[in-house]
Amino acid sequence: MKITKAEVDAVALLARLELTPEETETFTGQMDAILAYVEKLNELDTSGIIPTSHAVPVENAFRDDAVRPSIGVENALANAPDRVEGFFRVPKVIE
């Protein structure tokens, strides 16, 4: 499959990237090489391979919940530039 400059421009638009003509040319070649490699992988016989989502078995890695002491409000706010009633005060970001 041959990638065109128009396709690279379309992907750049979706990614909100502004590419120079030189970058478009470079990425066209790179994307074409990537897809050529994927096409080569499609030639492999995978009929006896079971589909998987992980290469190795994954088990739940979470630990049991345990109540432990925390650093406390005063220590957490010790270096806060501004605080109010035990909370961080931050600039308003919603208009």
UniProtKB/Swiss-Prot annotation:
Catalytic activity: L-glutamyl-tRNA(Gln) + L-glutamine + ATP + H2O = L-glutaminyl-tRNA(Gln) + L-glutamate + ADP + phosphate + H(+); L-aspartyl-tRNA(Asn) + L-glutamine + ATP + H2O = L-asparaginyl-tRNA(Asn) + L-glutamate + ADP + phosphate + 2 H(+)
Keyword Phosphoprotein assigned: no
InterPro entries, alphabetized: Asp/Glu-ADT_sf_sub_c, GatC
EC number: 6.3.5.-
Gene3D superfamilies, per database record: Glu-tRNAGln amidotransferase C subunit, N-terminal domain (1.10.20.60)
GO molecular function, one term: ATP binding
UniProt keyword terms in alphabetical order: ATP-binding, Ligase, Nucleotide-binding, Protein biosynthesis
Parts of the chain that traverse the membrane: none
GO biological process: glutaminyl-tRNAGln biosynthesis via transamidation; regulation of translational fidelity; translation
Broad class of enzyme this protein falls into: ligase
Similarity comment: Belongs to the GatC family.
Function of the molecule: Allows the formation of correctly charged Asn-tRNA(Asn) or Gln-tRNA(Gln) through the transamidation of misacylated Asp-tRNA(Asn) or Glu-tRNA(Gln) in organisms which lack either or both of asparaginyl-tRNA or glutaminyl-tRNA synthetases. The reaction takes place in the presence of glutamine and ATP through an activated phospho-Asp-tRNA(Asn) or phospho-Glu-tRNA(Gln).
NCBIfam families (UniProt xref): gatC
Record note on quaternary structure: Heterotrimer of A, B and C subunits.
Name of the molecule in the record: Aspartyl/glutamyl-tRNA(Asn/Gln) amidotransferase subunit C
Higher taxonomy: Bacteria, Pseudomonadati, Thermodesulfobacteriota, Desulfuromonadia, Geobacterales
Gene that encodes it: gatC
